[in-house]
Amino acid sequence: MLTACTKENETGGNTPSTPEAHGRLYNTRWQTTYDDHSIMDEGYYQDHYYVYRCTDVIHFTNNNSGTRHIDKEVYDLITQEVTGEHADSTIRFTYVYKGGDSQYGPGVIYWENGDSNKFYVQNIGGERIYVEDLERPDYNPPCFYLVQ
């Protein structure tokens, strides 16, 4: 099922066409499948920061300047997950890079100990690669899915 997204927040520049999310959520809390092609149109990754709200999924990227940013609304949604049975667990996200041609994705991104500055992925060897490193200008900015 394709889920249309609506733009919730933007800063600067021209507005690209509205993207579609190709995420297909399973009932299992932490599992998802996705199509790593055509996740976002090209304009989405140019000069701007956007937050898109979709049914069951949240997207955010930075503006490819190397600056870490997470929208407060998205942060609040994430922190709501750190309750109840999952209070001591790592929050997991799926993510994908434009082009799907990275050793880091598609895959799972983790939120470490409720610290909004500690998002990371693990490579095949188990090394933690933190999102602030992934978001340098020499990387394609990733697209994150909050798995609900």
Give the positions of each predicted feature:
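Short, solvent-exposed loop/hinge segments that bridge or flank secondary-structure elements
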Residues: 20, 27-64
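Short beta-strand element of the conserved SAM-dependent methyltransferase core
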Residues: 30, 58-60, 110-111, 131, ...
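Short loop/turn segments at connectors of secondary-structure elements within structured domains
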Residues: 54, 103-105, 140
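Bacterial Sec-dependent N-terminal signal peptides
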Residues: 2-29, 137-148
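Contiguous, well-ordered beta-strand patches that form the walls/edges
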Residues: 37-40, 61-136
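A broad helix-preferring feature
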Residues: 1-2, 56
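Short, P/G- and charge-enriched loop/turn segments at secondary-structure junctions
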Residues: 10-13, 45-47, 81
